[in-house]
């Protein structure tokens, strides 16, 4: 009897091994396909740290072979569906489903890159897996009126906000020191809860002529290059928000945990490819924004800014509490970028109208509003990941977690696994 049971166990393990091998081959096909699309669409691949053997061997064609890619996507999705239906493993089903979600985004991005038009809602649903709530003009007016009561002084709400914020503008010659200090402290906070690989590190560079404020270029092997755009003025809160978002416990930590736990420990080859326009980005951006508040609860953020960052920047600490109170209210206006993206993509709003919305309802200066328009024109519905992605991640992490330590633990689970968007809702 023992021999028979042992024989059955061998058969089971053998069957599981064959199934896993088949899924691995599909995962390799997914990576090859993504890298080949990336030969044409320079924004398609955000990071890749897998084997060189999966990179394209042939030079790209003179024209974008959209139909070829769409056909390959369709075949691969069908193969994944078949593999999932035959599998008795919940982990394998989830893995196949996660890759399929990514491939749905591949399909939409290929269509966008080839010039096919779609509405904002279809695009956001296919790329990021969500239906994005609409925020009316009345919504923004309500919070503007609330801010008007909070901000004292003459002039418009925008002028009053700018008068307050300019007190906390970081001098250009202090940016390096302030940001490196913020990143180092963010790492300390994160290391209290996550075991970080000894070899991990982030470098910091300052750049110009970009449509974004900060970017994490993940290099693989637990290394990142963080870039901060200095085209526009950088205020003191951004030293924490951007630095933490891009590094600890944001993008750098998200990528290294996936690499360690899935690619290196489990051999999930698909995780070595990070396609920018995919459901993975909703979790990446949402978790990076949520992680700022986790590492810097309001009281700690205020104390660290007041006692450490402002003195380093050579700035007066008077008014910082009121400034942070206003910024907390102003967060409610972040959805304005979604509505501007919706209007521009759907053709119901001109760039000039979009800029007016950003200045009026987002309390953005004209240079920042113009830079935001540039971002939307390039990245389109991607903007929803920063705010609606944050909402979904916050709901996921804070459900049934009563303490900060429990939230850190659930947050770590989110950053270490192939979590599908449906699991967040």
Residue ranges and their predicted role:
Residues 19-425:
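N-terminal maturation segment of proteins
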């Amino acid at each position: 009897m023992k021999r028979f049971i042992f024989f059955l166990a061998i058969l089971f393990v053998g069957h599981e091994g064959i199934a896993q091998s088949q899924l691995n081959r599909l995962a390799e096909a997914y990576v090859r396909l993504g890298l080949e699309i990336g030969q044409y669409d320079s924004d398609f691949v955000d990071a890749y740290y897998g084997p060189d053997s999966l990179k394209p061997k042939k030079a790209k064609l003179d024209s974008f072979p959209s139909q070829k890619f769409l056909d390959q996507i369709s075949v691969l999705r069908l193969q994944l569906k078949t593999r999932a239906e035959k599998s008795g493993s919940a982990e394998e089903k989830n893995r196949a489903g996660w890759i399929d979600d990514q491939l749905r985004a591949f399909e939409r991005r290929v269509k966008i890159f080839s010039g096919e038009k779609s509405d904002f809602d279809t695009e956001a649903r296919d790329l990021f897996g969500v239906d994005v709530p609409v925020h009316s003009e009345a919504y923004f007016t309500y919070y503007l009126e609330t801010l008007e009561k909070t901000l004292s002084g003459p002039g418009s709400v925008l002028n009053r906000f700018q008068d307050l914020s300019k007190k906390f503008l970081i001098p250009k010659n202090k940016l390096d020191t302030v940001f490196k200090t913020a990143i180092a402290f963010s790492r300390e906070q994160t290391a209290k809860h996550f075991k970080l690989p000894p070899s991990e590190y982030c470098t910091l560079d300052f750049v110009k002529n970009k449509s974004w404020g900060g970017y994490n270029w993940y290099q693989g092997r637990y290394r990142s290059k963080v870039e901060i755009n200095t085209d526009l003025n950088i205020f003191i809160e951004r030293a924490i928000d951007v630095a933490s978002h891009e590094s600890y416990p944001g993008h750098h930590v998200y990528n290294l945990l996936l690499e360690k736990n899935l690619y290196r420990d489990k051999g999930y080859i698909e995780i070595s490819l990070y396609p920018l326009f995919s459901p993975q980005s909703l979790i990446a951006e949402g978790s990076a924004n949520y992680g700022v508040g986790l590492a810097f609860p309001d009281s700690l953020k205020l104390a660290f800014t007041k006692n450490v960052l402002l003195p380093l920047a050579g700035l007066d600490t008077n008014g910082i509490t009121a400034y942070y109170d206003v910024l907390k209210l102003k967060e409610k206006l972040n959805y304005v970028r979604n509505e501007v993206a919706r209007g521009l993509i759907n053709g119901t709003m001109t760039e000039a109208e979009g800029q007016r919305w950003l200045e009026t309802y987002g309390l953005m200066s004209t240079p920042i509003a113009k830079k935001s328009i540039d971002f939307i024109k390039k990245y389109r519905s991607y903007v929803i990941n920063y705010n609606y992605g944050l909402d979904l991640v916050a709901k996921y992490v804070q459900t049934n977690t009563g303490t900060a330590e429990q939230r850190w633990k659930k947050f770590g689970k989110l950053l270490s696994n192939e979590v599908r968007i449906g699991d967040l809702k």
